[in-house]
């Protein structure tokens, strides 16, 4: 007699990785740009999720030259190769990746304060 009406409802607590088929065509993964607090006012910006097609050391070299900061590529046990830059470079990295065409706007995820 009674039917369940919300079988098709969205579950906000469902595992986010199960919805990969809902992403627009041409998007592989997200690029996460995070900021981490160091001692005092010093910060680190980390970039994770850049495809293996790109040479991360060359990207770091371009970032260092354009943003006038130091940077390196580290191997993270969970996330793989991660780019670390000194200072708050979140906006600069977003603009650079969009200008060069490495990423689309909807693929960027900026985390932090």
Swiss-Prot record:
Alphabetical list of PROSITE patterns matching this protein: SUI1
Alphabetical keyword list: Acetylation, Initiation factor, Phosphoprotein, Protein biosynthesis
Modified residues (Phosphoserine): 9
SUPFAM superfamilies: eIF1-like
A GO BP annotation: regulation of translational initiation
Domain of life: Eukaryota
One GO MF term: translation initiation factor activity
Modified residues (N-acetylserine): 2
Keyword Cytoplasm attached: no
One Gene Ontology term, aspect cellular component: eukaryotic 43S preinitiation complex
Pfam family, any one: SUI1
Similarity remark: Belongs to the SUI1 family.
PANTHER family recorded: EUKARYOTIC TRANSLATION INITIATION FACTOR SUI1
Role played: Probably involved in translation.
Name the UniProt record assigns to this protein: Eukaryotic translation initiation factor 1b
Taxonomy of the source species: Eukaryota, Metazoa, Chordata, Craniata, Vertebrata
């Amino acid at each position: 007699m009674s039917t369940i009406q919300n079988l098709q409802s969205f579950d906000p607590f469902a595992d986010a990785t199960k919805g990969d088929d809902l992403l627009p065509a041409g998007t592989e993964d997200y690029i996460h740009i995070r900021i981490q607090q160091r001692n005092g006012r010093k910060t680190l910006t980390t970039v994770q999720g850049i495809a293996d097609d790109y040479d991360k050391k060359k990207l770091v070299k371009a970032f260092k030259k354009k943003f006038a900061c130091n940077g390196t590529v580290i191997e993270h046990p969970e996330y793989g190769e991660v780019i670390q830059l000194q200072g708050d470079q979140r906006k600069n990295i977003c603009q650079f990746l969009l200008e060069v065409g490495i990423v689309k706007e909807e693929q960027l995820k900026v985390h932090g304060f």
